[in-house]
Amino acid sequence: MSGCPFMGKKHHFNFSELSLEDKNEDSSQEGLNKASKGGLIYGDYLQLDKVLNAQELQSEKKGNKIHDEHLFIVTHQAYELWFKQILWELDSVREIFQNGHVRDERNMLKVVTRIHRISMILKLLVEQFSVLETMTAMDFFDFRDYLSPASGFQSLQFRLLENKIGVPEILRVPYNRRHYRDNFKGETNELLLKSEQELTLLGLVEAWLERTPGLEEEGFHFWGKLEANIFRGLEEELQTVKTKPDSEEKEEQLAELQKQKELFGALFDERRHEHLLSKGERRLSYKALKGALMIYFYREEPRFQVPFQLLTSLMDIDTLMTKWRYNHVCMVHRMIGSKAGTGGSSGYQYLRSTVSDRYKVFVDLFNLSTYLVPRHWVPRLNPSIHKFLYTAECCDSSYFSSDDSD
């Protein structure tokens, strides 16, 4: 049975029965065709003559037109257009941070909105693989040889995106035992070098986190109070477990408490953090990590709600970039198996090596969940810091700056 309430019944509307008066009273026809008077029109504004004529099939040029090459080209052009939009949003966010505009909390919503927009675009790009996968491996094989030596690795915009977000150069997987920039020449190589020298989103967020209110030792001193509370809590739990009769469960609980003690001992050891930072296992400075954890614990306070959303959106970007890499790996494996890539790389093997935490920029934010503790262990806010976090102010020099930005 159809879900349409009109199925099986005759419902005809006789437009010829409309009177001239009814037709004249049709408000849907009261508009004005401004285009008839000349000026900018849709196709000109979007320069569709350029966009829609930019699909040049190499197979057709060689006299062997392959239908699915058109899909391959359009899909990758769409990726590049979206990469351009991501870079547009990312550059604007970096500019807001660089100019100190985040000190004015009114601009934080702008930052979060644009970062969230980036994550939504990345989500779309992850899903876009499903369109490309409607092409079979044999369909791709039919025109693959026409592409060489072109390769997705040569996407300048994707490499710029990685650099501007903050993928560490030293953690990149070598491309055929060479520096990734060696695959780019002239102006493109210079653009990549310039992007490596600019302040990254990671570095700018790090500096912002270091200014988190409440970290000052002469003030609320969140870090010192948290350390004292955690080790006091662990000691109390240890004494409670020790009173229990000997059993396998007791031994397991004692072992777990020892692990927790070592875990938090490492967290509060600044020298250990610096060591992990030098090895690339941590990305944020010690002070920035303190700020991130404080925002995490007090995220319900009005002043920390938007910063917490920002940290969440930054993790979303990392997650979606990882998903994009993974989907890319799966698609390449499906299309070419273990063959070499068109650009000369090992193909699937190389791409698989990039799906790791080496390419995660905000990995420290993911690891914050490691340090969750019972709520009553979190230092209680004193009246001064509670009042400070309860009200967001414009132009507050202690945390967030007075100039507006675009």
UniProtKB/Swiss-Prot annotation:
PANTHER family: TRYPTOPHAN 2,3-DIOXYGENASE. GO terms for biological process: L-tryptophan catabolic process to kynurenine; protein homotetramerization. Pathway: Amino-acid degradation; L-tryptophan degradation via kynurenine pathway; L-kynurenine from L-tryptophan: step 1/2. Belongs to the tryptophan 2,3-dioxygenase family. Heme-dependent dioxygenase that catalyzes the oxidative cleavage of the L-tryptophan (L-Trp) pyrrole ring and converts L-tryptophan to N-formyl-L-kynurenine. Catalyzes the oxidative cleavage of the indole moiety. Heme binds at residue 328. Its cofactor is heme. Its EC number is 1.13.11.11. Binds 1 heme group per subunit. The gene is tdo2. It is an enzyme of class 1 (oxidoreductase). Substrate binds at residues 72-76, 144, 342. One of its GO terms (molecular function) is tryptophan 2,3-dioxygenase activity. This is Tryptophan 2,3-dioxygenase. Pfam families: Trp_dioxygenase. It catalyses: L-tryptophan + O2 = N-formyl-L-kynurenine. Homotetramer. Dimer of dimers. Keywords: Dioxygenase, Heme, Iron, Metal-binding, Oxidoreductase, Tryptophan catabolism.
